[in-house]
């Protein structure tokens, strides 16, 4: 049996793997207006999915949308001003790309590590370290 026949046989006998394409999913932001404030209802669920601190994510949101923000007693983020779901979602996508996804392997298995004034993204999957 030559290589091509072995390869064909292996491909025929391999099991079909089904499931979702990714195991990492950030919930879509659930935002609503409350007066002149935008309330991010599922902020805690987003933090759980990202495995990041609320202070870091909230600071990024504030800087990107150019407003002040706080966390209320229910754990919801309150952004001063009116921001739509799309704007918050795009901001979260930018956060994930910068602070969660490994630039080398593309996996979300990362930790943020502080070294002096520098923040590094350390990938648990491939071992890469990059400054963010």
Swiss-Prot record:
UniProt keyword Cytoplasm, yes or no: no
Provide this UniProt record's keywords sorted from A to Z.
Initiation factor, Protein biosynthesis
What are this entry's molecular-function GO terms? translation initiation factor activity
Matching Gene3D superfamilies, A to Z? 3.30.30.170
Tree of life domain: Archaea
The record, for InterPro entries, names: IF2/IF5, TIF2_bsu_arc, Transl_init_fac_IF2/IF5_dom, Transl_init_fac_IF2/IF5_N, Transl_init_fac_IF2/IF5_Zn-bd
Q: Membrane: is it a keyword of this entry? A: no
Q: How does it assemble?
A: Heterotrimer composed of an alpha, a beta and a gamma chain.
Protein family per UniProt: Belongs to the eIF-2-beta/eIF-5 family.
Tell me, in a sentence or two, what this protein's role is: eIF-2 functions in the early steps of protein synthesis by forming a ternary complex with GTP and initiator tRNA.
Please state what the protein is called.
Translation initiation factor 2 subunit beta
- Organism, as annotated: Halobacterium salinarum (strain ATCC 700922 / JCM 11081 / NRC-1) (Halobacterium halobium)
Gene (name only)? eif2b
């Amino acid at each position: 049996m030559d290589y091509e026949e072995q390869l064909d046989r292996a491909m025929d006998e391999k099991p079909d793997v089904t499931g979702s394409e990714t195991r990492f999913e950030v919930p879509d932001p659930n935002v609503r207006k409350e007066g002149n404030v935008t309330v991010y209802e599922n902020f805690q669920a987003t933090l759980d999915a990202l495995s990041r601190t609320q202070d870091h994510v909230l600071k990024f949101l504030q800087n990107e949308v150019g407003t002040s923000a706080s966390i209320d007693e229910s754990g919801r983020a309150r952004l001063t001003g009116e921001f739509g779901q799309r704007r918050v979602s795009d901001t979260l996508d930018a956060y994930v790309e910068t602070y969660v996804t490994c630039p080398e392997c593309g996996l979300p298995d990362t930790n943020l590590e502080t070294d002096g004034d520098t923040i590094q993204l350390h990938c648990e999957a491939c071992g890469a370290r990059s400054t963010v």
